[in-house]
């Protein structure tokens, strides 16, 4: 059988989940599901994806690489250590040149503004492989995992506890777009960007979802179908580690928090995890964990993203 996006058309770049409307997001999830089942999609033979990763990566790098190979394309590593990016060449210059050589870029960098500059000058599809502001490909995989478990997305509730970071931003937008309620619980001073929360609330008003920004993790977890967390200290924040360990101590996914959730609740984590900090070993290895399915789904989600953005060019 052949997988297809049907008549759905996409913008050239995926810089934010807000670059996808509700129909496009559902189409991506359906395509990812079809690809996971082994259905074929128009391949990317002869296409080359450049990886510009200014941050360390395991899952994102490997899944993009394998996805591209499985779709018939190739990958080239354009990380700072082996390009002039690491020696201070302006982004606009690098982007203009890469746009003449490769067919798409997956970029992992510290600043969303830098990603946007690549997209502005490259003239080819640019995919957000993680910035300080969002991690959209991760959340496409998360939503795929949730849909596999519950058979639906609308009407569910996700509780995110921890730092209101890039993953939280993409979850807010993604959940709102599919009609899934989301409650985010963070310590004071670590809430998500108010502009992202406001945008998610606006979208939720159309889709019937609810968006809550809370302090109490147990209030957030009450009745939730999905518990989700991320590391308390992200890359680039290592100097804050001890301070954050104290502030986030009550924001751990453990047996007590899981008991507040719905009886059928599952647990997700974007990885890597610091076991014993944001999540206990017991929960990670327990029957409610879907973390390894979630990690696998990065591959299928990113195959769908690559096919959608690069397949018709």
Swiss-Prot record:
Cited InterPro entries: Asp/Orn_carbamoyltranf_P-bd (IPR006132), Asp/Orn_carbamoylTrfase (IPR006130), Asp/Orn_carbamoylTrfase_sf (IPR036901), Asp_carbamoyltransf_Asp/Orn-bd (IPR006131), Orn/put_carbamltrans (IPR002292), OTCase_ArgI (IPR024904)
Primary localisation category: cytoplasm
An annotated GO BP: arginine biosynthetic process via ornithine
Residues that hold carbamoyl phosphate according to the record: 57-60, 84, 108, 135-138, 270-271, 298
This protein's GO CC annotations: cytoplasm
Chain sites annotated for binding L-ornithine: 166, 230, 234-235
Pathway given in the UniProt record: Amino-acid biosynthesis; L-arginine biosynthesis; L-arginine from L-ornithine and carbamoyl phosphate: step 1/3
Reactions it catalyzes: carbamoyl phosphate + L-ornithine = L-citrulline + phosphate + H(+)
One example GO MF annotation: amino acid binding
One Pfam family this sequence matches: OTCace
EC code(s) of this entry: 2.1.3.3
Name of the top EC class for this enzyme: transferase
Location relative to the cell: Cytoplasm
Similarity comment: Belongs to the aspartate/ornithine carbamoyltransferase superfamily. OTCase family.
Known partners and oligomeric status: Homohexamer.
Function: Reversibly catalyzes the transfer of the carbamoyl group from carbamoyl phosphate (CP) to the N(epsilon) atom of ornithine (ORN) to produce L-citrulline.
Protein's recorded name: Ornithine carbamoyltransferase
Organism encoding this protein: Gloeobacter violaceus (strain ATCC 29082 / PCC 7421)
């Amino acid at each position: 059988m052949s997988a297809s996006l049907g008549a759905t058309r996409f913008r050239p770049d995926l810089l934010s989940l807000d670059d996808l409307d509700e129909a496009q997001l559902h189409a991506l999830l359906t395509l990812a599901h079809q690809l996971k089942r082994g259905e074929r999609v128009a391949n990317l033979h002869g296409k080359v994806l450049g990886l510009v990763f200014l941050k360390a990566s395991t899952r994102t790098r490997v899944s993009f690489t394998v996805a591209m190979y499985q779709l018939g394309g190739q990958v080239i590593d354009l990380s700072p250590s082996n390009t002039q990016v690491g020696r201070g060449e302006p982004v606009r210059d690098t982007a203009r040149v890469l746009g003449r050589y490769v067919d798409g870029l997956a970029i992992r960098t510290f600043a969303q503004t830098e990603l946007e500059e690549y997209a502005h000058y490259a003239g080819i599809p640019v995919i957000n492989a993680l910035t300080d502001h969002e991690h959209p490909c991760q959340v496409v995989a998360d939503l795929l995992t949730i849909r596999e478990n519950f058979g639906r997305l609308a009407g569910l509730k996700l509780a995110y506890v921890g730092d209101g970071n890039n993953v939280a931003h993409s979850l807010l937008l993604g959940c709102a777009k599919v009609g899934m309620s989301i409650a985010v619980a963070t310590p004071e001073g670590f809430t998500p960007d108010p502009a992202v929360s406001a945008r998610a609330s606006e979208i939720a008003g159309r889709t019937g979802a609810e968006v809550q920004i809370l302090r109490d993790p147990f209030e957030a977890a009450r009745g939730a179908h999905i518990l989700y967390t991320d590391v308390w200290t992200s890359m680039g924040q290592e100097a804050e580690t001890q301070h954050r360990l104290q502030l986030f101590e009550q924001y751990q996914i453990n047996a007590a928090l899981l008991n507040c959730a719905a009886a059928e609740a599952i647990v997700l984590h974007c990885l890597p995890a610091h076991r014993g900090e944001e999540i206990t070993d017991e929960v990670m290895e327990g029957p409610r964990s879907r973390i390894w399915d979630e990690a696998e789904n990065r591959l299928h989600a990113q195959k769908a993203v690559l096919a959608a953005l690069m397949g018709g060019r």
